[in-house]
Amino acid sequence: PLRPGTEKHTFPFPAEFCNLPADLGPCKNYTGRFYYDSASNKCEVFIYGGCPGNANNFKTREECRKTCVEICILPAELGPCDEYTGRFYYDSASNKCEVFIYGGCQGNANNFKTRDECRKTCVEICILPAELGPCDEYTGRLLLRLGIKQM
């Protein structure tokens, strides 16, 4: 149930919509907007037609940056509702995706349905542990080991 004065999100969490491509939309009232480019991890300018499009659309670079770029440093946030469910958030202190209890509405963007989604969004590839994988072919690979100054 919703607590008085709260409302459910009617759009996906930023972690989901920040990965959508820039969308001009069908209208022709062209204006400059910003979208989050997940490939470059930056907020970029795009031309918006003025209607529909998608939720990866911000009036200012700052709004885009606060919504999409910095989500991984936000704390876990329960939110004001009472529909408790397990979710994952990125804990920047431990550099891991951890479980937390989410109330079902509001909260913040550091909120992922799966650990894998959290890792893809927040964990830097160079701090992931080496994984051998399920196959039995032996192929040489390089591994970056942080804190070791050897070549």
UniProtKB/Swiss-Prot annotation:
The keyword Ion transport does not apply. GO terms for cellular component: extracellular region. GO terms for molecular function: serine-type endopeptidase inhibitor activity. The record marks 28-29 as: Reactive bond for trypsin. Coiled coil: none annotated. Disulfide bonds join 18-68, 27-51, 43-64, 72-122, 81-105, 97-118. Glycans are attached at residue 29. It is found in: Secreted. Keywords: Disulfide bond, Glycoprotein, Protease inhibitor, Repeat, Secreted, Serine protease inhibitor. InterPro entries: AMBP, Kunitz_BPTI, Kunitz_BPTI_sf, Prtase_inh_Kunz-CS. Expressed by the venom gland. The keyword Repeat applies. It comes from the Eukaryota. Its main location: secreted. PROSITE patterns: BPTI_KUNITZ_1, BPTI_KUNITZ_2. Residues 18-68, 72-122 form the BPTI/Kunitz inhibitor domain. Serine protease inhibitor. This is Kunitz-type serine protease inhibitor bitisilin-3. The lineage of its organism: Eukaryota, Metazoa, Chordata, Craniata, Vertebrata.
